[in-house]
């Protein structure tokens, strides 16, 4: 699919979007530390999260196995960064829109947060994942430097106390 077609599909789905060659997606193993801090509570408790999802090197290899990165962004109003209900809503809505878009693309998703196909993840109950081909890891699990990614594809990257920006990508 041509770049213009990808951008049009993404914009029709409600995303700000950009396209970048997959080998230009910046990764750095130091970003795995964000997962290891376990602020989201999913480290070792979600099939899509570290350490289960793979090492930083394995995640980089998944990125390099693809040709194109369709980078996606949505923004959501929040009261502040303690507004966990609005933040969760923004991230989950973004990820669901990403999955719907990917139904027609068949790519590999890196979400704005961890996989949300099952809440809670079946890993927490000792069951196997019912969606191994659909589950997705987050940008941090892929060790993506999102600020640099935005710079490379011309997107604005900024923190705002009252506006949540959620980033993801579909690798094709």
What are the residue ranges of the model-derived segments?
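Auxiliary alpha/beta "docking" domains used to position bulky ligands
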Residues: 1-172
């Amino acid at each position: 699919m041509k770049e213009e077609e990808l951008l049009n599909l993404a914009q029709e789905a409600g995303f700000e979007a950009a396209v970048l060659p997959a080998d230009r997606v910046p990764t750095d193993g130091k970003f795995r530390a964000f997962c290891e801090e376990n602020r989201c509570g999913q480290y070792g408790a979600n099939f899509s999260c570290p350490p289960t999802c793979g090492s930083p090197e394995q995640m980089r290899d998944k990125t390099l196995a693809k040709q194109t990165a369709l980078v996606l962004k949505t923004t959501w109003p929040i009261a502040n960064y303690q507004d966990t209900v609005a933040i969760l809503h923004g991230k989950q809505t973004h990820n669901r829109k990403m999955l719907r878009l990917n139904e027609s693309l068949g790519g590999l998703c890196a979400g704005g947060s961890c996989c949300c196909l099952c809440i809670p993840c079946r890993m927490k109950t000792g069951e196997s994942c019912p969606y191994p081909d659909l589950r997705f890891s987050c940008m941090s699990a892929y060790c993506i430097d999102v600020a640099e990614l935005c710079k490379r594809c011309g997107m604005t990257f900024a923190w705002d106390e009252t506006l949540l920006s959620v980033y993801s990508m579909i690798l094709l």
